[in-house]
Amino acid sequence: MAMEGPILCRAVMQAKLPVTMISNSLTKSGQLGTAFLGCVCKYRNITRLISPIYQPAQKNFATVCGSFSSSSDGNGYMAGNFSESDEDYVNSTVLEAVEVRSGAEGYVIKMRDGKNLRCVHNNSQGRNIPESAPQPAIVLRIEDGSETLLPIIVLEMPSVLLMAAIRNVHIARPTIYQVVKEMIDKMGYEVKLVRINKRIQEAYCAELFLTKVGDHTESITFDLRPSDAINIAVRCKVPIQVHRSLAYSDGIRSVEPARMAIAAGMSDGLLFTELDRPDGQPCVEAQEFGLIRNMLIAAVEERYKDAATWRDKLMLLRSKRKNWA
């Protein structure tokens, strides 16, 4: 059953603030642009596009075309419903990775502790790897026993905020992800799970699933960037699932088991490896990441003098590294 026709609604009075100013306040520092403006929201079977474009009204009434269709496809499936145990998806966890560099020999993942993990495609028919400089990334480990990793290139700010959430770093001012989490709670919904569902060319897509508190048959689905969806999932402590076809076609695996399995000592029958404990040497990469994190957090909290101080320390460290090289 479907109904279509014009709907009369009272025109909204022109706001004093232009939309560009509102958008800029949500996309501070240019890092979270179009994070939620313009996203597609699917409420059961009603699909609507939330447009950030504001049109000032010239009349008291305006005509809007709307549509409504049946909530069943004939098989009892309610549009917007989902199954957390869908066999097409597999659970994953977030690794504490900082950046990913790719080249002809594969991938190199830099971990938060400064260690480098060299990887290659999980299958011989994987995508061709274009050479690229180190880029901020979120790395997911597929929890199916295969030790497959899925690197997702993101902007630097979402990567830093994700590491802050994983390490429980306190940020004085609320981030956009904390605001969204509180908005969802106020609306009477809860985050159920996040899914990385497809890739369009080189860009991954994600879905955020919400359910009504007390009535899980009522759900809403949002299409988001993976960096935003994963940040929300970590803060809400919900599963992050990856489509199995993506894990198979784009997944990578470590090819340096020798470095990871070198015995560094035995204690009470436990084998400690080089990767499991520090070697006592200063790690310049970890120090550099700490300075970058402190600088970005200070900028988010609008402590610009502190951010400038961290920036100067970072430039000094990098200049020393260049001289050493």
Swiss-Prot record:
The keyword Nucleus applies. InterPro entries: BFN_sf, Bi_nuclease_dom. One of its GO terms (cellular component) is nucleus. Its EC number is 3.1.-.-. It is found in: Nucleus. Gene3D superfamilies: Bifunctional nuclease domain (3.10.690.10). It holds the Pfam family BFN_dom. The keyword Flavoprotein does not apply. Its main location: nucleus. Residues 119-254 form the BFN domain. One of its GO terms (biological process) is protein ubiquitination. Residues 285-320 form the UVR domain. Keywords: Hydrolase, Nuclease, Nucleus. PROSITE patterns: BFN (PS51658). Belongs to the bifunctional nuclease family. Bifunctional nuclease with both RNase and DNase activities. Involved in basal defense response. Participates in abscisic acid-derived callose deposition following infection by a necrotrophic pathogen. This is Bifunctional nuclease 2. It comes from Oryza sativa subsp. japonica. The gene is BBD2.
